């Protein structure tokens, strides 16, 4: 099967489509508190999924990285308002060192093509 890579930087692709599955690289936003960053990241996720043939209701799995687990409840309040009942993906959330000090959350997504 063909592998399609989109928006490559020489280091990574923002999206890869293979076997009717969309893989998104980690999405971040470096401004605001964890709620604001989560909102912006989820907007990016939704835009990329729509651009490459999927949407948030077709998300299969999500990996969420938080700089500090104290932000878990705040991040979840945004996530829970965004994801629709009945379309909850498999999900993991872990505390992680981030690439930049200003990053509080990073989300990677795997979704089915519509």
Model-found features: residue ranges?
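N-terminal presequence-like segments and the immediate start of the first folded domain
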Residues: 1-60, 66-114
